[in-house]
From Swiss-Prot:
Domain of life per record: Eukaryota
Transmembrane keyword on record: no
Site (Transition state stabilizer): 172
Biological function: Adenine glycosylase active on G-A mispairs. Has glycosylase and nicking activities and is active at A/G and A/GO sites.
SUPFAM superfamilies documented for this protein: DNA-glycosylase, Nudix
Protein known as: Adenine DNA glycosylase
Gene Ontology CC: one annotated term: nucleus
Domain Nudix hydrolase: residue ranges: 296-437
Motif mapping: Nudix box: 340-366
Catalytic activity: Hydrolyzes free adenine bases from 7,8-dihydro-8-oxoguanine:adenine mismatched double-stranded DNA, leaving an apurinic site
UniProt keyword annotation of Hydrolase present: yes
Organism: Schizosaccharomyces pombe (strain 972 / ATCC 24843)
Amino acid sequence: MSDSNHSLDLHSYTQLEVERFRESLIQFYDKTKRILPWRKKECIPPSEDSPLEDWEQPVQRLYEVLVSEIMLQQTRVETVKRYYTKWMETLPTLKSCAEAEYNTQVMPLWSGMGFYTRCKRLHQACQHLAKLHPSEIPRTGDEWAKGIPGVGPYTAGAVLSIAWKQPTGIVDGNVIRVLSRALAIHSDCSKGKANALIWKLANELVDPVRPGDFNQALMELGAITCTPQSPRCSVCPISEICKAYQEQNVIRDGNTIKYDIEDVPCNICITDIPSKEDLQNWVVARYPVHPAKTKQREERALVVIFQKTDPSTKEKFFLIRKRPSAGLLAGLWDFPTIEFGQESWPKDMDAEFQKSIAQWISNDSRSLIKKYQSRGRYLHIFSHIRKTSHVFYAIASPDIVTNEDFFWISQSDLEHVGMCELGLKNYRAALEIKKRKVTSLSNFKEPKLTSARRIVTKAEC
C-alpha cells in the first residue's frame, strides 16, 4: 500500500532548488574530498575520427576509473587503496589487463578482497573494451550496461561521468540514502517504482558541467555525513533543502506534518508511519525504508592444513586444491575441505578427520602423516552465509603422495596464487599467525604440536 497523504510533487525539486543542490554539493566536495590514487582529472574523449594516439589518455583514464569503481563495490576505501595500487602496478593498462591470464595473473591481485565475481566481471569488461576501436566505446550509461559484459548501470554511470565527463547519474546505497532523505521518499528504494524514481532524480540532478565531481560528492556525502544511523545534519551542505530534515524540525517544534494533495497522489511511499515519539528521535534516519533482512544460513566444514617440509631446503609446502567452478568462492584456491552444509557437527571430529584423509591422500601414504592437531572452530561471515570451519593442522612426511586435483604450493607462493580469504583465515588459525602483526604469510614461527596422534578440541561455536 502507499501513503497517499501527499502528492508526487513532494519528491521533486524546482529548478532553483536543483541549482542550489548542485552548487552546495560541489562546494562541499571541493572542501572535503579525500585524496585517493584513482581521483584524477577527467579526460574528455576526442572526436570519433581522431587518430589513435589522441585516444590513449581517455582510454587510460576510463580503465583507471573502471578498476577503482568495481573494487569499491562492497569494499572499504582504505582496503581498496592497497589493492588498487598493486593492481595498477601489475596491470597498468587496459590492454595489459585484457591479455593477462585470469587464474594466474588477475585473480591473485584480488585475493583477500572478497566478492570474487567482481574480479571476473572486471576482467571480462576489459577484454571486451580492448577489442573495440576507442571510438566504438559507448558514451551513454544505457549502451554500457547493455553492451559491456560485467558492467551494470551504476558502474557505467560512474565510469562515464568521472572518466569522460558525461552527464550521467549514478545510484548506489549511498546515493539512495541521500536522495531518499533529500526528497522524503519513504519506501524501499532498491527496487520497483521507488528505485526508478531515484534513478530519474539522479539523472536530473547531475551537474552538467562537473558530472564526475558531482557524483563523487553525492557518494562522499552518503559515506561520511548522511550516514545510515546517525546522520550529521548540522554539517550537511544540503540540509536547508532536505525534506527529511525539514520534517524533523517541524516535529521537534511540536507541530504536525501536513502536505497539500495536488495533482497525482503519491503511490510510492508506504504506510509505515512511525509514532510521534519515534519521529522526534529518528525522523531523518527513517529514510529510506529497509527491507527485512534474510537470515544468514549456518554452514559447517572440516578443513585441514597439510604441511610438508623439503628436507634439503627446509622450505615449507602446503596442500591446496581449486574450488568447484560454480558456487561459493568458485574457482579459487583453498585447502582440503569436507563440507557438512547445514548439518550438525559430527560427534567425533577426530574420526571425521581420519575418514576424510582417504579423499586426499593415497592409501600407501596415510601412515606418512606424522602429526595432526585440532585447532578449533573459526567463523567467517559472508553476505548470506555464516561459515564455521573446524580446522586441523597436519604435518606430513616429504614423501607423502596425494590424490589427483591436489597440489603442493610453497609458503611464499600462497600470497600470490589467488587463495580465498576463507582459506587464508583458516591457514592463519592453524599456524597461529596474527593477521595484523605480520607483513607476509611466511613471517611466523611454526607452532609445536603436542602429540603425534589424537588431539581433539571440543570447542563449540
